[in-house]
Amino acid sequence: MKHSTYYSLPSLVKAGKKKAHKKEVISFDLFDTLLIRRIHDPDLVKLPVARYIADLAKQQGIHKGWQTIQGWRDAIEREHRHETAKTFEDHEACYPSFMRELLQKVFGSSFDESLLQQVTEYELAMESSMLVPRQAL
């Protein structure tokens, strides 16, 4: 598949509109296209989320270190990516699926869907604080 590079939002939109009438689906990578991160390693956003989950667990009498939780997340996310790669080219993991699995592992029978919602909102807030719109080159 041939990929094109555009150096301004207007040129990207123009090309997208031109190609759109011939396609059912058009996709592009949002990150580094329209948005850039303020940090060099996007995985660094995951660390405060692991701390947040550890704090939530501690409130319920579950004592797991954030490093343990982060290790579990990495392993679960890696397994989900591996499973996706069997069917799709993108090797992406579905956030609600892997995060639900992680939270079930951490909280056991105390898990409920409101925890997933809480953690998702926290992670989105962390992610949003790291994003800025890309300026034209």
Segments predicted by a language model, with ranges:
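Generic start-of-chain signal for non-secretory N-termini
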Residues: M1-K18
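Active-site neighborhood of HAD-like aspartate-dependent phosphohydrolases
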Residues: V13-G71
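A metal-dependent, Asp-based hydrolase signature
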Residues: V45, V49-Y122
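Catalytic cores of eukaryotic secretory-pathway lumenal/extracellular enzymes that build
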Residues: S128-Q135
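Well-ordered alpha-helical segments embedded in enzymatic catalytic cores
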Residues: L12, A136-L137
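Generic amphipathic alpha-helical segments used as scaffolds and interaction surfaces in large
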Residues: I36, K86-D90, S128
